């Protein structure tokens, strides 16, 4: 268990170090657990969160039945795209996957958000 957590921490640090080069762009950060999926758009220069969406919202709970799968992640991506469209000039940002590999629901979320016209 200790080796797994160390791998997660190393991967998280490695990803964040690469993202620090793009401080001019906003950061789209994700967190996933066994039951929920969270997304935030963060401005690291001032420490402000502009938009957030998760599987804890009523629209997602009604359709996804409290599971983190491709259907619930697609709904979260749709909610996030609606909230990002309300912001001005927010079509390009950096995708912070944290300690998670780019497979499964992480890749599904990223591809779904790209299909709505966002670049990262």
Swiss-Prot record:
SUPFAM superfamilies: Translational machinery components. This is Large ribosomal subunit protein uL18. GO terms for cellular component: cytosolic large ribosomal subunit. GO terms for molecular function: 5S rRNA binding; structural constituent of ribosome. Part of the 50S ribosomal subunit; part of the 5S rRNA/L5/L18/L25 subcomplex. Contacts the 5S and 23S rRNAs. The keyword rRNA-binding applies. This is one of the proteins that bind and probably mediate the attachment of the 5S RNA into the large ribosomal subunit, where it forms part of the central protuberance. Keywords: Ribonucleoprotein, Ribosomal protein, RNA-binding, rRNA-binding. One of its GO terms (biological process) is translation. The keyword Ribosomal protein applies. Pfam families: Ribosomal_L18p (PF00861). Belongs to the universal ribosomal protein uL18 family. CDD domains: Ribosomal_L18_L5e. InterPro entries: Ribosomal_uL18_bac-type (IPR004389), Ribosomal_uL18_bac/euk (IPR005484). The gene is rplR.
């Amino acid at each position: 268990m200790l080796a797994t957590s160390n791998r997660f921490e190393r991967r998280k640090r490695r990803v964040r170090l690469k993202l620090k080069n793009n401080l001019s762009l906003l950061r789209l950060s994700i967190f996933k657990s066994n039951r929920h999926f969270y997304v935030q758009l963060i401005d690291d220069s001032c420490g402000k969160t502009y938009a957030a969406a998760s599987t804890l919202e009523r629209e997602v709970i009604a359709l996804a039945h409290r599971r983190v799968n491709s259907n619930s992640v697609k709904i979260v991506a749709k909610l996030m795209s609606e909230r990002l469209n309300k912001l001005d000039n927010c079509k390009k940002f950096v995708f912070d996957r944290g300690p998670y590999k780019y497979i499964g629901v992480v890749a599904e979320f990223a591809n779904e958000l790209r299909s709505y016209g966002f670049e990262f």
